[in-house]
Amino acid sequence: MRKIVHVDMDAFYASVEQRDDPGLRGKPVVVAWRGARSVVCAASYEARTFGIRSAMPAVRAERLCPDAIFVPPDFARYKAVSRQVREIFHRHTDLVEPLSLDEAYLDVTHAKTGMQLATEVAQLIRTQIREETQLTASAGIAPNKFLAKIASDWRKPDGQFVIAPSRVDAFLLPLKVNRIPGVGKVMDGKLAALGIVTVADLRQRPLEELQAHFGSFGQSLYRRARGIDERPVEPDQEVQSVSSEDTFSEDLALDALDPHILRLAEKTWLATRRTERIGRTVVLKLKTSNFRILTRSYTPEQPPTSQEALAQIALALTRRVELPTQTRYRLVGVGLSGFSDVEDGAVQGQLFGQMPPLE
């Protein structure tokens, strides 16, 4: 039986800002550029009490808390702290799979320290993070990645939670299905329409029914409802693609997709910055009202070096590539693929320096 730990830094970007500027401590801090189409990168726990969340439009965050202090992201500083945290991880195991700057999976089945209890390993890691970075982290401990990720949210901030193999069903079955990664608002609504509200409800449905309604994701739902996740922790797995998608409650015409594409371009760009790599190919994904998936891509001579460039290419793909204009669409996605390491200094400065919001 594997011992998997999911470590998630608490309000990471905002916490770094509060650590480095005592004047921000105890105040609602929002890490974001200002602008009509900017999104929140992170919110301090004080800001979260007003309902502010990551990926929320910055203008909405400002409406929710007019007194919030907006701080532009400093990704170079966040990456430096992230490297400190990863060095701590590697003291305990070489099986470390970073998901972003602020979270990672660790397989501690055979911890370097010789510690047998995964809970003790997680506690020591969190203590070392606190002592060496003055930041807090939460952890989930479980037999697989799926359960460990859910568990890491259970005692936030600055806590940890374990799901023992013998307690998987007792923990999982009462959960709302929207706690399953990948089940957003639209999917949650579709499941509710089928009478599926909890994981226990989901487990009652046969695989064939779930696949009929949700395609390949139906198989994932079937397995997650049983606590099954056989994915290994993949050490330092390099990101090959990043994307963001929107599923609509009502199907939209092609010419109504522009604002969604602009917002998704920013979300994808923010996620790309966390990888410290360059994405060279822009990918547009569309799902029609009859569930047909269309993808279009373009690889420019120079990779996109701003969210604006990414958005412009994605928008151009809807206009310059033959698409059925009379068709209505239920999903749009914007992504980057063909990733490589940042080597050119000028490109690195363009990619990871100051990023103005789309105007």
From Swiss-Prot:
The record marks Y13 as: Substrate discrimination. GO terms for biological process: DNA-templated DNA replication; error-prone translesion synthesis; SOS response. Its main location: cytoplasm. It is found in: Cytoplasm. Binds 2 magnesium ions per subunit. HAMAP family: DNApol_IV. This is DNA polymerase IV. It comes from Xanthomonas euvesicatoria pv. vesicatoria (strain 85-10) (Xanthomonas campestris pv. vesicatoria).
